[in-house]
Each structure stands twice: as C-alpha cells, then as structure tokens.
Swiss-Prot record:
Gene this protein is translated from: rpmB
Gene Ontology process terms (BP): translation
PANTHER family: 39S RIBOSOMAL PROTEIN L28, MITOCHONDRIAL, LARGE RIBOSOMAL SUBUNIT PROTEIN BL28M
Protein name: Large ribosomal subunit protein bL28
UniProt GO cellular component terms: cytosolic large ribosomal subunit
C-alpha cells in the first residue's frame, strides 16, 4: 500500500538529516497517515480510508459526503 493520503494526495517528500556538524544524509519525510472508518449516512455503510490527520480535519469541516463526491470525480474508488 502506497503512503499517499486518499483525501489530500499528500505523499512522502525527501530532504536531509542534519548532524550537529551540518553533515547531510538523505531521508524521507512521511505523511501522518491513519486508517479510519467513517459512517456514510447516505449510503448506510462504513467507508475505510487511509488519510492524514489534515484529511480528517477536512472531513470534519466539509462532511464525508462532499469529500467522497470529490474523490469519485478524481477517479478514486471508494
């Protein structure tokens, strides 16, 4: 399973670890992914999503029905 948020599309980015001597070694910054079940009242079922904490806040703000509609327009299977 790829480390991509289903709502926001956030994915890992690369950068550097920096030691005290400012030596650089490559590293990955991973998104804060959580697996969460949401109850969709209009469909009378649970939907399981892999999303970031920010994605959960977006669902709290807009509502699960609107977010699922936006995901389906993008071609995401839900």
């Amino acid at each position: 399973m790829s480390r991509v948020c289903q709502v926001t599309g956030k994915r890992p980015v690369t950068g550097n670890n920096r030691s005290h001597a400012r030596n650089a070694t490559k590293r990955r910054f991973l998104p804060n992914l959580q697996t969460h079940r949401f109850w969709v009242e209009s469909e009378k079922r649970f939907v399981k999503l892999r999303l970031t904490a920010k994605g959960m806040r977006i669902i709290d703000k807009k509502g699960i029905d609107i977010v699922l509609a936006e995901m389906r327009v993008r071609g995401e299977s839900v």
